């Protein structure tokens, strides 16, 4: 279950990649703008502000996120991105930090250009940090005998979940698009107790939390916290640097 409040705890850090992604989309007067994986809608509303004359279509697979987006006045619907098909007037498709959850996302990126009108834009951002300590430590802890019996079916993600920018660029170029792809590592300054643990609780640890009972979840967090604190030590000023690699691709259908 997604927790919109937990996700929004780091809204500024999560928002910056979205705005940098959209800065490369040069759509002037799109008819329909689509946000796939809109989350709680806090970033989606900026699409309406940028393109006020466009029809804004937003969806997410999480009912909690859809409810939060609707509370912001968005006409959001619950939908699996794999089931989405663009309407004929779709001129901009945005997916920010969502497709890493979809194993078939490469096939979607091949398919969408064949379904979109000429001149349409596709803008995608995915995390590229699955080999970072924030992920490897979780996978290691979950594999220990104490936890492996409780977490046999949790889909822990490795670096193969997403591709490098050049791979996405090639995929979309082969699909007939003009492509702009890049990566950025944000050295994020976090504050508070166990800030990296709090960050991943809203995303990477969600399947773990869903699989455990409340007492087990508390114990897992208790064991995980010092391991993350060692990998991401607190600085003398009380802050913690959390490097986070992200992958971007913007494509225009030719």
Curated annotation (Swiss-Prot):
Keyword terms of this UniProt record: Cytoplasm, Methyltransferase, S-adenosyl-L-methionine, Transferase
An example Gene Ontology CC term for this record: cytoplasm
InterPro entries attached to this UniProt entry: SAM-dependent_MTases_sf, Trans-aconitate_MeTrfase, Trans_acon_MeTrfase_C
Catalysed reaction equations from the record: trans-aconitate + S-adenosyl-L-methionine = (E)-3-(methoxycarbonyl)pent-2-enedioate + S-adenosyl-L-homocysteine
Pfam families: Methyltransf_23
GO molecular function per UniProt: trans-aconitate 2-methyltransferase activity
Record localization: Cytoplasm
Gene Ontology terms: biological process: methylation
Main location: cytoplasm
EC code: 2.1.1.144
Function per UniProt: Catalyzes the S-adenosylmethionine monomethyl esterification of trans-aconitate.
Protein family: Belongs to the methyltransferase superfamily. Tam family.
NCBIfam families: PRK14103.1
Protein name: Trans-aconitate 2-methyltransferase
Naturally occurring in which organism (per UniProt): Rhodococcus jostii (strain RHA1)
């Amino acid at each position: 279950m997604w927790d919109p409040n937990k996700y929004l705890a780091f809204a500024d850090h999560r928002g910056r990649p979205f705005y940098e992604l959209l800065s490369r989309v040069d759509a002037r007067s799109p008819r329909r703008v689509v946000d796939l994986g809109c989350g709680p809608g806090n970033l989606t509303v900026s699409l309406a502000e940028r393109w006020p004359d466009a029809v804004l279509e937003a969806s997410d697979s999480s009912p909690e996120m859809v409810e939060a987006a609707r509370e912001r006045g968005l006409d959001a619907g619950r939908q699996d991105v794999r089931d989405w098909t663009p309407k004929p007037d779709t001129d901009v498709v945005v997916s920010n930090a969502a497709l890493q959850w979809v194993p078939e996302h490469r096939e979607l990126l091949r398919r969408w250009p064949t379904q979109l009108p000429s001149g349409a834009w596709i803008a995608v951002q995915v995390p590229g940090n699955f080999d970072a300590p924030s992920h490897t430590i979780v996978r290691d802890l979950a594999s220990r005998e104490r936890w492996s019996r409780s977490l046999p079916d949790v889909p822990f993600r490795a670096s193969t979940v997403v591709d490098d920018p050049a791979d996405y660029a090639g995929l979309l170029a082969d699909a007939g698009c003009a492509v702009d792809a890049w990566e950025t590592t944000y050295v994020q300054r976090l504050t508070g107790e166990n800030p990296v643990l709090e960050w991943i609780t809203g995303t990477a640890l969600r399947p773990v939390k869903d699989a455990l009972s409340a007492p087990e979840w508390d114990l897992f967090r208790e064991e995980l916290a010092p391991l993350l604190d060692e990998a991401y030590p607190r600085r003398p000023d009380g802050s913690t640097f959390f490097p986070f690699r992200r992958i971007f691709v913007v494509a225009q259908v030719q």
